[in-house]
Amino acid sequence: MLSKLASLQTVAALRRGLRTSVASATSVATKKTEQGPPSSEYIFERESKYGAHNYHPLPVALERGKGIYMWDVEGRQYFDFLSAYGAVSQGHCHPKIIEAMKSQVDKLTLTSRAFYNNVLGEYEEYITKLFNYNKVLPMNTGVEAGETACKLARRWGYTVKGIQKYKAKIVFAVGNFWGRTLSAVSSSTDPTSYDGFGPFMPGFETIPYNDLPALERALQDPNVAAFMVEPIQGEAGVIVPDPGYLTGVRELCTRHQVLFIADEIQTGLARTGRWLAVDHENVRPDIVLLGKALSGGLYPVSAVLCDDDIMLTIKPGEHGSTYGGNPLGCRIAIAALEVLEEEHLAENADKMGAILRKELMKLPSDVVTAVRGKGLLNAIVIRETKDCDAWKVCLRLRDNGLLAKPTHGDIIRLAPPLVIKEDEIRESVEIINKTILSF
């Protein structure tokens, strides 16, 4: 009886505490409303208090975007030179993609793959004909596309190449980045990604990037099913391989009966001045991964493209996703691809990128030690001192009206939306130059 009474008293106390908490929260919310919209500082503090600390954002609180620009909650305007890591290549809130989303969202958004829908086949036909592959497997995020490619490679290795079951290997390049799932970090050579998350996926090996002799040695192993590589390494710091590297990869993979998987999640879809970055060397990978700009930044959409001899090794029930291939995502992806085609954004990226790099090369070499990139995927390398590093440069760029983000310490990635015009490139370069000269 006493224990029951104690329990009742505890419950009553908890209820009183809950009412107090709710009242307090309501009071804070009311006070916040009375004070007007949240400030940047309030937004920073709220995220820090309630969200996981798995990112280190540049301190700017954004509320609106259009084309190549974004605005913070105080109304300040910025050039966007990150494009959500390339996802908003078509520009923020592109009207055609927005309209496609609106037209579909009132009709049907999700069926799962338990049933057919009337948009998936239209999208599959469009994207496979556009890139000249037999089949597409629709997923949502870039890392899901990478996982899909690994499963396809292993299954193909067992059923087509004849690798002993569960002995298949996939080779990756040092500096690779394709996500943060356990499989992705198992292939990583960056301690920030993998340290403390083992044990790791077996059957993954790494070799130096841009090193054809190393690849040839690795492919001597008959258990290698695939080599997965970024045509330009993005997260590693926009590392552009030597001319002929991708041609050599294609030749070696063909010679050793190994699948060439091109991770075009960041480099593909016109970003480097071609539809795919591999197009610079006119090579055709066995598997192509697409994502990011495949939806124009409106919705997570990714895709894995390959031919029947690879894709059809996976049977019904062996791989999939509840949201992959949903009608909303498919309608958005069609529109996003049409924008790239209709607005000739690959050509614009090629032209604007050349202007950008030419102007960046004029920056003082005592601060900027290197400029590299293709199309509108570029980077500058900052000489670190006690007063100057990539993070400090990005903070000052923000203050001057341009948003960019460091990658790997001393490197700043510069990747604006592909709709940027020449006068906007030159205005952006003036901001970058002014910022660099201030150090």
UniProtKB/Swiss-Prot annotation:
Modification N6-succinyllysine, positions: K102, K107, K362, K405
- What is the superkingdom listed in this entry's lineage? Eukaryota
Q: Which GO terms describe its cellular component?
A: cytoplasm; mitochondrial matrix; nucleoplasm
Q: Where does the transit peptide start and end? A: 1-35
**Which tissues show it?**
Expressed in the head and flagellum of epididymal sperm but not in testicular sperm (at protein level).
Leader sequence segment: none
Xref: SUPFAM superfamilies: PLP-dependent transferases
Q: Which reaction does it catalyse?
A: L-ornithine + 2-oxoglutarate = L-glutamate 5-semialdehyde + L-glutamate
Q: What is its EC number?
A: 2.6.1.13
Q: Where in the cell is it found?
A: Mitochondrion matrix
| Residues with PTM N6-(pyridoxal phosphate)lysine | K292
Pathway entry: Amino-acid biosynthesis; L-proline biosynthesis; L-glutamate 5-semialdehyde from L-ornithine: step 1/1
Q: Spell out the Gene3D superfamilies in the cross-references.
A: Aspartate Aminotransferase, domain 1, Type I PLP-dependent aspartate aminotransferase-like (Major domain)
> InterPro entries in the record, alphabetically?
Aminotrans_3, Aminotrans_3_PPA_site, Class-III_PLP-dep_AT, Orn_aminotrans, PyrdxlP-dep_Trfase, PyrdxlP-dep_Trfase_major, PyrdxlP-dep_Trfase_small
Entry keyword set: Acetylation, Aminotransferase, Mitochondrion, Pyridoxal phosphate, Transferase, Transit peptide
Coarsely, its chief localization is mitochondrion
Q: What does this protein do?
A: Catalyzes the reversible interconversion of L-ornithine and 2-oxoglutarate to L-glutamate semialdehyde and L-glutamate.
The UniProt family comment states: Belongs to the class-III pyridoxal-phosphate-dependent aminotransferase family.
The record ties this protein, via PANTHER family, to: AMINOTRANSFERASE CLASS III, ORNITHINE AMINOTRANSFERASE, MITOCHONDRIAL
Q: What is this protein called?
A: Ornithine aminotransferase, mitochondrial
